[in-house]
UniProtKB/Swiss-Prot annotation:
Species this chain originates from: Halorhodospira halophila (strain DSM 244 / SL1)
GO CC field: cytoplasm
Record note on quaternary structure: Homodimer.
Predominant place of localization: cytoplasm
GO biological process: 'de novo' AMP biosynthetic process; IMP metabolic process
Binding annotation for GTP: 13-19, 41-43, 308, 334-336, 416-418
Protein's UniProt name: Adenylosuccinate synthetase
Free-text comment on the cofactor: Binds 1 Mg(2+) ion per subunit.
Cofactor: Mg(2+)
Keywords from the named record: Cytoplasm, GTP-binding, Ligase, Magnesium, Metal-binding, Nucleotide-binding, Purine biosynthesis
Example GO molecular function: magnesium ion binding
Gene3D superfamilies from the UniProt entry: Adenylosuccinate Synthetase, subunit A, domain 1, Adenylosuccinate Synthetase, subunit A, domain 2, Adenylosuccinate Synthetase, subunit A, domain 3
Record function comment: Plays an important role in the de novo pathway of purine nucleotide biosynthesis. Catalyzes the first committed step in the biosynthesis of AMP from IMP.
Catalytic activity: IMP + L-aspartate + GTP = N(6)-(1,2-dicarboxyethyl)-AMP + GDP + phosphate + 2 H(+)
This protein's encoding gene: purA
Length: 431
């Protein structure tokens, strides 16, 4: 039997999952996306060449990997086709390697328009979405009025569903937000054209994955965003619109939860966040340490281009993420960004309303008032960039990683020491 591995982010996204997934696909026959949409930006660097994927699983660059987009993903057909064409222009036969669940809810132009209109109306209180229609598409899914990929293959069915949907959303756009409305015929024609192109790529994803498991192929489930952005367990309402935890891998692809063998949590050696919301260990952009992390780590979002907020490693939040996901191992990324710092700080608790707290508050209002309690550790002057053996790391770097293991309660299985796939230390292979 093969091994089924789930990769999830343990922070607020941008942990470096794309590179690690790409590295792990050497041992995976199938790579599956199970939630989110094209709001996720996975950056891969292979032989110095950078590729940013938003929807298609990172394994698409592997010749022998089958890539799957599961039913838990909200699908922008336009964005997907654009990504497919970009890959084909680079000589990657994406259509041959990609299969998509026909049950995927679609992101339509009205969802993007609603996303922008809402953020504009909220002003300074805006959540800081990517503006790509993810939230409104998930809303329609839950409200049972959404259009699915399979609807694009049936003109009359699509016309009826789309007409009802646009009547609803155009009313809100026009009378509530004072925003332009969507033209029914234009949206219908575009959707039908997308359906023609995507129909050959559809498959029963649950059945496909189950069949692959029976043949003994390893399967990698690729998460997007991060645990602290989970719609239920994250810093609500400053979260994404899907379940980003490991449990969603089963529901978002149609396989049973007992088929998941190993859960790998990706975390930076420090912490970053894009958009609004509480961030206890945040450092100011003009702070010397905050500037170091931002500049050395090239902390700009792959999807939005926004500068990421940077701070020290938060062991309290990561420990909670480890519990929610039942992590088997941690992968620490961007360790090399900490090179040259004299002192490193680890958040080991919070001081909330005068009391010491060692767990992550569930209410965002309480978390916003929390002050980090730090434990200082000595840094290292040596470069860790490109190191591929754990024993070759500086002694203080190994001590830092060991302390993270103790605080989070999960072994460090992998360490990334640079953006290239080869700049990776493996202590325990998930496969």
């Amino acid at each position: 039997m093969g091994t089924n591995v789930v990769v999830v982010g343990t922070q607020w996204g941008d942990e470096g999952k794309g590179k690690i997934v790409d590295w792990l696909t050497e041992n995976a026959g199938v790579v599956a996306r199970f939630q989110g949409g094209h709001n996720a930006g996975h950056t891969l660097v292979i032989d110095g060449e950078q590729t940013v994927l938003h929807l298609i699983p990172s394994g698409i660059l592997r010749e022998d990997a089958t890539c799957v987009i599961g039913n838990g993903v909200v699908l922008s057909a336009e964005a997907l086709l654009e990504e497919i064409r970009e890959l084909e222009a680079r000589g990657v036969p994406a259509r041959e390697r990609l299969r998509i669940s026909p049950s995927c809810p679609l992101i339509l132009p009205c969802h993007v328009a609603l996303d922008h209109a809402r953020e504009k109306a909220k002003g300074k209180a805006a959540i800081g979405t990517t503006g790509r229609g993810i939230g409104p598409a998930y809303e329609d899914k839950v409200a049972r009025r959404g259009v699915r990929l399979s609807d694009l293959f049936h003109r009359e069915r699509l016309a009826q569903k789309l007409g009802e949907l646009l009547d609803y959303h155009n009313f809100v756009l026009k009378h509530y937000f004072g925003a332009p409305t969507m033209d029914f015929q234009e949206v219908l024609d575009q959707a039908l054209a997308h359906g023609e192109e995507l129909r050959p790529l559809t498959a029963d994803v649950g059945a496909l994955l189950t069949a692959e498991m029976r043949t003994g192929r390893n399967i990698l489930f690729e998460g997007a965003q991060g645990t602290l952005l989970d719609i239920d367990h994250g810093t609500y309402p400053f979260v994404t619109s899907s379940n980003t935890c490991a449990g969603a891998a089963a529901a978002g692809t149609g396989v049973g939860p007992r088929t998941l063998d190993y859960i790998l949590g990706i975390t930076k050696a420090y912490t970053t966040r894009v958009g609004q919301g509480p961030f206890p260990t945040e450092l100011d952009f003009d702070d010397e340490m905050g500037m170091h992390l931002g500049e050395r780590g090239h902390e700009f979002g792959a999807t939005t281009g926004r500068q990421r907020r940077c701070g020290w490693f938060d062991a309290v939040a990561t420990r909670r993420a480890a519990q929610i996901n039942s992590l088997s191992g941690l992968c620490i990324t961007k360790l090399d960004v900490l090179d040259g710092l004299e002192t490193l700080r680890l958040c080991v608790g919070y001081r909330c309303q005068g009391e010491l707290c060692e767990t992550l508050p569930s209410e965002v209002e309480t978390l916003s008032e929390c002050e980090p309690v730090y434990e200082d550790m000595p840094g290292w002057a040596e470069s860790t960039s490109g190191i591929e053996r754990y024993e070759d790391l500086p002694e203080n770097a190994r001590a830092y990683l060991g302390r993270i293991e103790e605080l989070v309660g999960v072994p460090v299985a992998m360490i990334s020491t640079g953006p290239d796939r080869n700049e990776t230390i493996v202590r325990q292979s998930p496969f």
